[in-house]
Each structure stands twice: as C-alpha cells, then as structure tokens.
Amino acid sequence: MAEPRTASPRRLPALRRPGFLPPLLPPPPPPLLLLLLLLPLPAPSLGLGHSAELAFSVEPNDDIANPGQPIVLGCKVEGTPPVQVSWRKNGAELPEGTHTTLLANGSLLIHHFRLEQGGSPSDEGDYECVAQNRFGLLVSRKARLQAATMSDFHVHPQAVTGEEGGVARFQCQIHGLPKPLITWEKNRVPIDTDDERYTLLPKGVLQITGLRAEDSGIFHCVASNIASVRVSHGARLTVSGSGSGTYKEPTILVGPENLTLTVHQTAVLECVATGNPRPIVSWSRLDGRPIGVEGIQVLGTGNLIISDVTVQHSGVYVCAANRPGTRVRRTAQGRLVVQAPAEFVQHPQSISRPAGTTAMFTCQAQGEPPPHVTWLKNGQVLGAGGHVRLKNNNSTLSISGVGPEDEAIYQCVAENIAGSSQASARLTVLWAEGLPGPPRNVRAVSVSSTEVRVSWSEPLAHTKEIIGYVLHIRKAADSPKLEYQEAVSKSTFQHLVRDLEPSTAYSFYIKAYTPRGASLASVPTLASTLGEAPVPPPLSVRLLGSSSLQLLWKPWPRLAQHNGGFKLFYRPVSATSFTGPILLPGTVSSYNLSQLDPSTVYEVKLLAYNQHGDGNATVRFVSLKGASERTALTPPCDCRKEDVTNHTSTTGIVIGIHIGVTCIIFCVLFLLFGQRGRVLLCKDVENQLSPPQGPRSQRDPGILALNGLSRGEGGQLSRDEKPVDAKELEQLFPTAGSAAQPGSTPTDPAAPAPCEETQLSMVQLQGFNLVAGRTTEATSPCAGPGPVPAPQDIGPVPLSEGQTQPPAVAAPQ
C-alpha cells in the first residue's frame, strides 16, 4: 500500500541538470492579500472603463483548488458605462449568494471551494464572465474550475539487477490534478541530486548510469501536489560484479514514447541504451529536418530535452545507439505532437451599415489542430438561416437586409482541444432620412393546400422612392433563422406564395426598399394552408425468395403530424378481395410479404392517408416465377425425331444431332435466301421461329413486374424484343446476299430447300442462335435434286493441320 505522508516544505527537483530550475509548490497567499480578497465589495455597474467598445481586459483562467480554499476568477471589462457584469456557470446564470461575491472590478470570489455533498452543488464547472451595456452583451472565454486530486500509484517501481558500469532504470506512474511532482528516495533518504550519474525525468523515471556497488539499496517514488503526498512501494537495486570483459551488442532498453504537448511546454524524449563497449546515443528526425540547437539539451546519457516547444517541433524523432567505431546500430522512434490553442490572425471589426443593406464580419483564427469557429450574437449562439449566412468554414458572417433587430455585439469564438479565444465587434444600423414606413394592412389568405395569397397596402409616407418589396416567409413553428424571401415589384400589392406544405401555419411580413435602405418590417400575419389527402407514394419491389418479397418506399414523417400513415393491400389477381388494410406509421419505409404462391401473380396497393382522407394508391403487379423457375430459354428450332425410341443409345444420339443440325440449316437458309421462301417446313420449326412467349427468366432472375413492360394478352412483343427480319439479317451477314448470283437458275418456290453440308458460325440475336452457312458441292441425302445457287465469294474454308473436312459443330442440346 502507498503510504500517505505530510508534505515536506523542501524544494522538489524535477530535472537534475544545470540549466533546469526545480519547480516549487505554490506558496500560500499572504495573509493581508487573502483578507482583501475576502472583503465584499459592491457590485459593479458604472465606470468600469471608458472605451467606446465593450471588451475584456482581463478574462478568467482555468484553476485547480482544494476543498475549503477561496478562489478568485478574474474579470475586468472596458466599455461605455453603465456596464453590468454577471457570471454563468455551465451556461446558466449564476445567482449571487453568501457562497459567492461579485467584486468591484467584475471578478468572482468563491469563499470556500466545495465539492458536491449533502445536497450542496459542487463548484466544479465552466465559468464565463458576462458584460452588458446599451450596445449589447459580451461573453468571456470559458474558465474550467476543478478540484485537486491524487490517485493511487497504478505503476510501482520494480526490482532491478545490474552489473557494475551498467544502467538501472526505475519508473512509477500516478495521476493527479495538478500533475504530481515526482521525486525519489534511496533507503528513505532523498537521492543525491549532485551525483551526475542520477537522472530524474518529470514523467516519473529514475535512471542510474555507471552502476557501482554502493548504488545497491531500496528505492521509493514520492508523488506530491496540493492535494496530497504519496509514496510508492519499495524496489531493490542489486549491483553484481563487473562484466566489462564481455562483448555485448548495443541494445535500446527504453525508447521514446509518443507525446502530445501544448506549446511552451517541455518535451522529454527518453532513450536508454546498453552494450559493451558503451554505445553512443544520437538523435535525428525521421523527415530529415535538423533538430536545431536552441532550447535543445541532452540529459543523462541520451535523453533529449526540448524546452518551450512549438508546432514546428512536431514530428517523429529517432534515437540511434551506435557501437563505437562501427556501423552497428539500433534505433527506436517516437512521435511528438505539439498542439497550439486557437489565436486570431484577423479580428472582426465594428461596422455601421444602412438599413436594408448587407453587413459582413470576417474572423480568421489559427491553431493546431485547426480551431472551430462559432459566432455569438449578444452572447447567444448564432446559426445560419434566413438572412444570416456563414461562409468559408464559418470565418465570414454575412447579414443581409439588416434592420434594428440586427444591432448587437457579435463575437467570434475560436476553439480547439488546446484552448479557446474570442473577439468581438459591434454592428450599428443607420437609418436614412425619408425612408418609407412599414407596409400596411398585410393580410394572408389560403388559396389551396400549397398556396397562400399575401396582400398589403403601400406605406403612408415617402412612397415615391420605393423600388420594390421583399416578402419574408417562414413556418410559424420554425426559428426566424429558417425564413426565406421573395422579391415583389413596386407596383404589385399582392403575391401568391407557392410550393408550401399542406396543413401548415406560415408567418409573413414585408419590407419596402428604396435606394437608401429598407423600411421597418410590417406587422407579421399568420395563415395556414388547406389540407389535402397525400399523393401516391413511390413503391418498388425486391425479391427475397421463392415465396416472399419486400416492398420499399420512402418514409414520410410528416404524416404522423397529421394523424396519418400508410395502408397496404395485396391479393392474387384471381381473387376478388384484398388482404388488408395493413396500417403502417409514416416513419416506416418497407414491409415484407411471405408465404406467397410462387405460381401466382399478385396485385399490391400502397396509399398514404391523413386526417383529410386516403390518397390515391400506387399499384404493382408482381410475379414470383422469376425466383421459382431457373430454366433455360427454349431453343428456337426444336426439331425432334418423333420415332426415336432409344434415347440412351449412341445411334439415337448421333441421329438426333444430325437431325437438329439439318433443321437449323434449313432455318438459316430460309432466312438468308428470301427468294427461296415458301419452303415447306415442319410445323414445329415454324412455331419455334416465332418470338418466345414465355417470361425471359433466364435474362432477368429478379421479379417480373407486370406494369405495362411485359407482353400483353394479344401477343405483342415486349419492349426489349423485336421480330426477326430478313433485311436485318442481310445487314448482319453482308456476305450472304439474298439475290441469286448471275448464271444461277431460279428454283421453284414450292420446292423444298436442299439440305447441304455447311461450316457454321453462331451469332446471338434476341435470344436465338442464328446460323450462317456456306454451301459445298456435295448435297445432303435429306434434300431432293435441284441446282444450288453459289453463294457470294467469301473465301476458302480454313482447315487446321491434318484436317480434310470442316470441323463438326455440336448441336444445341
């Protein structure tokens, strides 16, 4: 167990090297000063400052306190009196009471810092100083007040055994607020900080180089801050005999850790190396940039110290341990990230603008990481909307059509993880003489569910210079930031506002504009659009399985505001009644139908409803055959040998192949040589030359939705099909002309086409295998006698080596 101990008044060193000053525990405040702080002073209201602009000359800072300790959060304001100062805690107004006192200069005194107990709230939190005068309101940066704490050790030092001349390292870790100061004791006595062999690092590390026998002992880690003092468990150091005669490769025992610091802090990159002979430790940056010399120091035998770090010090640092006189080296690396709090490169400037014009503030801040910029108007967060625009990552604030309601103090607040900063500016709206008054008699009348007609009368005075009107529109339930505008001609005194939402209340007001500025706004008027039943919702279908499907649509959350939702119906097309309605809320976007008949076509209806009734339905016809049937398309020419009795014999297979090839040749020759039409073909071949009538499930395995895209009852072709045309085939096969060659003898159109040996080439067309052929001198025994016209010269038939006949082509199965 860690042993609690009363804090000693001695100084506690952090870095034991020349050039490093040991930090001190904060001394108690002088009694006289403490007495003055505790004296209550009257609340400030007058004469805080005489600068024209309201601004903070002192802002509160973060602080850490012990319970019972008095705390003062500083705040000083300059500006045109009278100035009222108040405080906020965690965003809420902090009431005055006996526990806190507002001092004359605007600072806040907390008499006795307390934690939450017995129903009393804790004083921990974020505090803001608020200043206000007749020009506006200003809020300071946030100051965080925390209680001092000290945890138990979560890493205690461990026993170490080393050789004479070697290196020993102890480490302890503990958390606390403020960060604990770590010191070390040997055998209950503070270690000798004058011994250069002892190196103390502020993160709780003790390094001992050049070990000697007298270094043996028990070491303790001592952590202290304003909250407490704690002592770790003891760890024994045992130093054995010298091993200087044994060669050892250089080894890095501990390399640098990844560090994240804030600018102006001190970075300690540790590197402990051993070996025999003792290795030489050096440092470099991974990106090749020089480390530099200003603020750089090596502590002990290889620890790199960077004082007053900047963002430029960020990078990866490499520790190298080299064996003297050789290139043998070991390396370790760690990343240093330096963060910088937000600070302003460009402050917003106070401006004056005529009424009705545009005011613009620019605020640019830098920091690491890049800060986020927020705008405040009189202490309240200002968002984009209406006539307020934020551009360039919130660095530019634009206010169009400024009016008296826009006069305020605007603050730019830049904040990142390292800190925050604020700057302010004031907007003054100028009113020119002779501006028209506000438009009069503004009325709004509902015309339909999406339209409202707004009418008005021109102002009483100064109407000759009016160049137009601007109508401001927003939902009555929305913030003024969400309003939008529509411009109207100067000769028009009514305007039809379109594209509104049904059954919704809207607010309207209007301004008159002249070259010198805008008038005051008219009195706002309200009107509600008429109600109507919802429009049909878009509906799509997705297949889930052979007997289930999913219906999809877009949710309409607005339906819930008008006592509405969706109604779903479905039925087989052969049924007389629907299943349903299935009532669904407006936030639902899908519904699954299951246990359906795969062989049945279903009719599905979806409609939206509200307090005005049911809207029109969206209807879909859905078939599940695409999921239940995965069969190939029927071949276009399905000529079969009717008298084949043994389908499994080799002879039957060969005969079937020849018959199939012959029928395909007949089909192609008939299509290629149109003059040979009126060929007597078997009825099966003629039927198969027609476009297929069944659903093309093989091309589209999804749902077949029968919504005017599929084939009708009359046998018309679907959208993606077309009949086979002889002219189209001539374009596809230009070498196979339809006219007879010179010298050929015309054949009897009633005579059957000869069946000849061919060499085939397959071309895919509309789901059919079309065959283009070349005739040879030999005739097929299946055709009658008759001359065959020679085809166009398309060259000799190529034969492979050792081949005497054209290769056989497998018939489609």
Swiss-Prot record:
<comment type="similarity">
    <text>Belongs to the immunoglobulin superfamily. DCC family.</text>
</comment>
<keyword id="KW-0677">Repeat</keyword>
<dbReference type="Pfam" id="PF07679">
    <property type="entry name" value="I-set"/>
</dbReference>
<dbReference type="InterPro" id="IPR013783">
    <property type="entry name" value="Ig-like_fold"/>
</dbReference>
<feature type="glycosylation site" description="N-linked (GlcNAc...) asparagine">
    <location>
        <position position="616"/>
    </location>
</feature>
<dbReference type="InterPro" id="IPR013098">
    <property type="entry name" value="Ig_I-set"/>
</dbReference>
<feature type="domain" description="Ig-like C2-type 4">
    <location>
        <begin position="341"/>
        <end position="428"/>
    </location>
</feature>
<keyword id="KW-0472">Membrane</keyword>
<feature type="domain" description="Ig-like C2-type 3">
    <location>
        <begin position="250"/>
        <end position="333"/>
    </location>
</feature>
<feature type="disulfide bond">
    <location>
        <begin position="75"/>
        <end position="129"/>
    </location>
</feature>
<dbReference type="InterPro" id="IPR036116">
    <property type="entry name" value="FN3_sf"/>
</dbReference>
<dbReference type="InterPro" id="IPR036179">
    <property type="entry name" value="Ig-like_dom_sf"/>
</dbReference>
<feature type="region of interest" description="Disordered">
    <location>
        <begin position="1"/>
        <end position="21"/>
    </location>
</feature>
<feature type="region of interest" description="Disordered">
    <location>
        <begin position="689"/>
        <end position="724"/>
    </location>
</feature>
<keyword id="KW-1015">Disulfide bond</keyword>
<feature type="glycosylation site" description="N-linked (GlcNAc...) asparagine">
    <location>
        <position position="105"/>
    </location>
</feature>
<feature type="region of interest" description="Disordered">
    <location>
        <begin position="775"/>
        <end position="813"/>
    </location>
</feature>
<feature type="domain" description="Ig-like C2-type 2">
    <location>
        <begin position="151"/>
        <end position="232"/>
    </location>
</feature>
<protein>
    <recommendedName>
        <fullName>Immunoglobulin superfamily DCC subclass member 3</fullName>
    </recommendedName>
</protein>
<dbReference type="GO" id="GO:0016020">
    <property type="term" value="C:membrane"/>
</dbReference>
<dbReference type="InterPro" id="IPR003961">
    <property type="entry name" value="FN3_dom"/>
</dbReference>
<feature type="transmembrane region" description="Helical">
    <location>
        <begin position="653"/>
        <end position="673"/>
    </location>
</feature>
<dbReference type="InterPro" id="IPR003598">
    <property type="entry name" value="Ig_sub2"/>
</dbReference>
<feature type="glycosylation site" description="N-linked (GlcNAc...) asparagine">
    <location>
        <position position="646"/>
    </location>
</feature>
<dbReference type="Pfam" id="PF13927">
    <property type="entry name" value="Ig_3"/>
</dbReference>
<feature type="disulfide bond">
    <location>
        <begin position="363"/>
        <end position="412"/>
    </location>
</feature>
<keyword id="KW-0732">Signal</keyword>
<feature type="domain" description="Fibronectin type-III 1">
    <location>
        <begin position="438"/>
        <end position="532"/>
    </location>
</feature>
<dbReference type="GO" id="GO:0050885">
    <property type="term" value="P:neuromuscular process controlling balance"/>
</dbReference>
<feature type="disulfide bond">
    <location>
        <begin position="172"/>
        <end position="221"/>
    </location>
</feature>
<feature type="glycosylation site" description="N-linked (GlcNAc...) asparagine">
    <location>
        <position position="393"/>
    </location>
</feature>
<keyword id="KW-0325">Glycoprotein</keyword>
<feature type="domain" description="Fibronectin type-III 2">
    <location>
        <begin position="535"/>
        <end position="630"/>
    </location>
</feature>
<dbReference type="Pfam" id="PF00041">
    <property type="entry name" value="fn3"/>
</dbReference>
<feature type="domain" description="Ig-like C2-type 1">
    <location>
        <begin position="49"/>
        <end position="151"/>
    </location>
</feature>
<dbReference type="InterPro" id="IPR003599">
    <property type="entry name" value="Ig_sub"/>
</dbReference>
<feature type="compositionally biased region" description="Low complexity">
    <location>
        <begin position="9"/>
        <end position="19"/>
    </location>
</feature>
<feature type="glycosylation site" description="N-linked (GlcNAc...) asparagine">
    <location>
        <position position="394"/>
    </location>
</feature>
<keyword id="KW-0393">Immunoglobulin domain</keyword>
<feature type="disulfide bond">
    <location>
        <begin position="271"/>
        <end position="319"/>
    </location>
</feature>
<keyword id="KW-0812">Transmembrane</keyword>
<dbReference type="InterPro" id="IPR007110">
    <property type="entry name" value="Ig-like_dom"/>
</dbReference>
